[in-house]
Amino acid sequence: MSCFSQAINPITGQNSWQERGDDYDYHLEVANAGFGDMLHDWERNQKYFAALKKTIAGMREAGREVHVLDIGTGTGILSMMAVEAGADSVTACEAFLPMANCAERILAANGAGDKVRLIRKRSTEIQVGEDMPRKANLLVAELLDTELIGEGAIGIYNHAHAELLTEDALCIPARARCYAQVAQSPLAAQWNSLKTIANLDGEPLLHPPEQLKSCQGEAALHDVQLSQLPSSAFRPLTDPVEIFQFDFQRKQEREKQRAQLLKLQSKQPGAAELVFYWWDIQLDDGGEILLSCAPYWAHPQLKELAAEKGNDHPLPNVVPWRDHWMQAIYYIPKPLQLVEAGKSFHLSCHHDEYSLWFDAREEAPTKSVRRHTCTCDLHMTYSRSRIGQINQSPRNKRYLRYLEESIEAEKSNVLVLGNGCLLGLASSALGAASVLLHEPHRFSRRLLESIVKHNQLKNVQFLDKVEELEDSQLAALTHIFAEPYFLNAILPWDNFYFGTLLTKIKDRLPQNVKISPCSARIYALPVEFLDLHKIRAPVGSCEGFDLRLFDEMVERSAEQAVSLVEAQPLWEYPCRALSEPQEVLNVEFSNFSQEHSLKGSIELKHSGTCNGVALWVDWQLVEDNSPRSIVSSGPSEPVVPGEFVKWDMFVRQGVHFPRRPKEPITHLEWSTAFKPELGELNFTFGQKKL
């Protein structure tokens, strides 16, 4: 039986009803649950297994029975490890029913169906005597996220110790330690604040208003693969320091709120703009089995891992890869200037039950530092990547070059399409006679209105709908400009909504109006990812346990609920190019409604496994042959087959993950079907050996 659900089509901007099976939401949740990524984390799996073997053997030697509780069992992998390690009884709980049902089948397939009691509940709903016969004396769980406590670990451990565990219970992991490193990074700071927009001569065009300068930003973490941040892009001002410990094993409750004030000294002069954050866990009681989420430069096993992997991987990629536990950036509310090496300052570290926040001050604060929130609309409206994109100087210069060469003072009448288009506002500062700004989003509009007021721009008018434009306004237009950027866009080509808006007014536009961008090209590039492909790759077996039933479940769900192309920030996920990029679609915005059906083949020029296809959009600002007239959402440097691709760091690209071929391939075949009036843009890919 089918049902209909409503969704916004980003290309048409229309709400549409889509026919989906009754179990669509179930398939979507299964496909996006992220269990596969964890199961590809070989270090996590090996060390959990080693800790279970060591702990259970130690309990046996002490003459104790071993009764295990596995909270959030997922596939049942940790429960099967506990059985293999010799536990007397194992109880597992899993509240996500599709996963629990799959775990039941996996346990049976691995001969553990009658050895593990599976409870389809949250651990906080379990009652001893009703759901499990006795309290457990060994808890094994994976309740952690990038922030460590963001998935509710504090409350879950507190409840387990109070209700489900014996007084002398052991836990795997036993403890966690959190680390902070204060740094300066002009590049990373672009993800958090708005810079002045200047013309090509460096003269200011738009200044941020005072409310943006005084805003402390959002305290929420910015999770990134920190090892991929170029070493040239930041200055470490301190060594990593331990800020909090979490003892998962102690019977006493873990505090839901704590503060730590550290007096530190700067290693070199700079601005304390941000905090790099990560954690490690001691999986066994003795602290001998350690798993660290540190970036490569702070990883305790860097030398051994570098020697082991040799020249196959760049140094930032020799440490174990995982996408479920990354590192985080926290932005200091007001950057602190440290004018010399050895300068003392105070780092305030805080956590509540689910999150952390930080502050840096020269003097010790006299009272607790409250968690800060956005007061300027910027941080609450736009993603980190969009804020960085607004600040991206090389990109902005290409738009400003077009505007400076195209706008005639007191003569040009400009229509700006898109959300948060400060570059469009810059046309007013460049002398345009009038600027009509299409900005239907309430918070984005409020932010732009504050910028207009602060910069005393007198000739700007805001619009909710392009259809509301009068014929006289349209007839007077000389320019239509966009980046384009729209808040509903996820994939780069979702910003083709620019073309949809143009078609609504096309018949009423003067013939000589200049439209920029005039066209857009989508490129495809076969690549070999070092690691990213694992998020969609089948697991097969893990530590000797057969997980093919899990693979089948995820594959069925992915076929029904996951797009063939998904958005990823590829600068965080290294990949080698296997060929040159190939154009797979060219759209002229003056004729946007034209349908396209294309196909082609890309010859692989470098040996390697094609485990991904990267896609992006190049925006052509004006019809000429200058590379400066192109703004790309893809590689930031020319692509060379066999070499790692350097990607734009302020936008997400599209990625297709092909199935692993049974034999080496020589060509990637592709087809593109674009129906703009329906907002349908579909790609298919096939791998062939010729």
Curated annotation (Swiss-Prot):
GO terms for molecular function: histone methyltransferase activity; protein-arginine omega-N symmetric methyltransferase activity. Its EC number is 2.1.1.-. PROSITE patterns: SAM_MT_PRMT. Residues 14-357, 366-690 form the SAM-dependent MTase PRMT-type domain. Disulfide bonds: none annotated. Keywords: Methyltransferase, Repeat, S-adenosyl-L-methionine, Transferase. GO terms for biological process: peptidyl-arginine methylation. It is an enzyme of class 2 (transferase). InterPro entries: Arg_MeTrfase, MeTrfase_PRMT7, PRMT_dom, SAM-dependent_MTases_sf. Pfam families: PrmA (PF06325), PRMT_C (PF22528). Coiled coil: none annotated. Belongs to the class I-like SAM-binding methyltransferase superfamily. Protein arginine N-methyltransferase family. PRMT7 subfamily. Essential arginine methyltransferase that can both catalyze the formation of omega-N monomethylarginine (MMA) and symmetrical dimethylarginine (sDMA). Specifically mediates the symmetrical dimethylation of arginine residues in the small nuclear ribonucleoproteins SmD1 and SmD3. This is Protein arginine N-methyltransferase 7.
